Amino acid sequence: MNKLWIRLLLVIAILAGAVCIIMREPVKLGLDLKGGVYAVLEAAPEKEGDVIDNETMNSLIEVLDRRINGIGVAESVVQKAGNNRVIIELPGISDTTEAINMIGKTALLEFKIMDENGNLGPTLLTGGALKKAQVGYGNLGEPQINFEMKPEGAIEFARITRENVGKQLAIVLDGKVQTAPVIRTEIPGGTGSISGNYTVEEAKRTATLLNSGALPIKAEIVETRTVGASLGDE
């Protein structure tokens, strides 16, 4: 009889512990409960017929995950689908355009010398040299993006500015010149700013993109839709 009671008490204790653990775990509210944006991103090989390897796809997922975390989306889903697609779920997001702006941009930052005719030279430095980027404000209070480079990037940036005094240094994002100031003197320390008539929100979004890194491969959003909170309404 005593053994039976001991076993019964042991079972009750185990069940109570399991309930406590379950209650402590946060309930994940996906698209069914919160609604949001569902998107499918398709990676494209550089050359037709090339195969995209798992390492590249994993790198793509990591960058996308950092971007989404950077804008504070909780309970998001970023997962591989098939050989070259990524499914993205963003609960609580209602602005599809905003989501596309964050997900679909390559965010390739390049530093190039611009000649007097506006022609761009070869890429001298990329966003891979950045340590961090954050929103700042210029002399007139206009939003801009302040950046700091990694040690090796700072050394290269100093060399580039030293050897090109008097020339324009174009800062290019996804093929579009953001700003092209004239280099007045060598810039040591690896710090600088990017101005481009940004709103505060645009500056924040761009800083997040730069901090998360450029997509490792060209990718295109092939499907996107807003999903209602179907279960939450029941």
Across the structure, where does each feature detected by a protein language model lie?
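A structural signal for conserved, well-ordered secondary-structure elements
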Residues: 1-234
